[in-house]
């Protein structure tokens, strides 16, 4: 396998979203990449198993195990002016979240957003010294209230870009 092919596979696997609990897009991408190498199965819980070049029954087996899921956010409420209230799906280093670009995955497609928090000049001295709580963060979609209500819904998943 060439270095270019390995990089293409890595790009494909890292560009597909698979937030914890809804990993199917990542599992499907992994299964597609593994299919030319052997017999692939996706379990009901989303695990991908590939038997590569099955040999003699007494031949040694090797297991390559990796997580397919990623941490993310989930929309809990639509606020006014196109802002989305969120909860975390998995653990985040909250210090890294303010101003981070995100992608909101919806039934209507994927849309960009950015994580917003209380600006430093409006925060109390105490709040300025600690990372914001997840429940205090919003996703700025850049949409009007009406457009946001057409595009987004509670339960939509959000992934961090990059």
Task: Report the location of each language-model feature.
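N-terminal hydrophobic/helix-forming segments and targeting peptides
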Residues: 1-162
């Amino acid at each position: 396998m060439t270095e270019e092919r390995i990089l293409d596979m890595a790009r494909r696997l890292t560009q597909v979203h698979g937030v914890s609990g809804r990993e199917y897009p990542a599992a499907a991408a992994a299964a597609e990449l593994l299919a030319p190498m052997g017999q692939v199965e996706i379990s009901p819980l989303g695990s991908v198993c590939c038997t590569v070049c099955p040999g003699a029954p007494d031949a040694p087996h090797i297991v390559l195990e990796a997580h397919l899921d990623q941490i993310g956010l989930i929309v809990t409420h639509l606020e006014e002016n196109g802002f989305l209230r969120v909860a975390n799906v998995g653990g985040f280093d909250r210090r890294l979240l303010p101003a981070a670009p995100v992608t909101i995955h919806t039934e209507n497609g994927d849309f960009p957003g950015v994580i917003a928090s209380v600006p430093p000049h409006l925060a109390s001295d105490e709040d300025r010294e600690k990372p914001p709580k997840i429940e205090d963060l919003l996703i700025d979609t850049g949409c009007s209230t009406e457009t946001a209500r057409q595009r987004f819904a509670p339960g939509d998943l959000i992934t961090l870009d990059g």
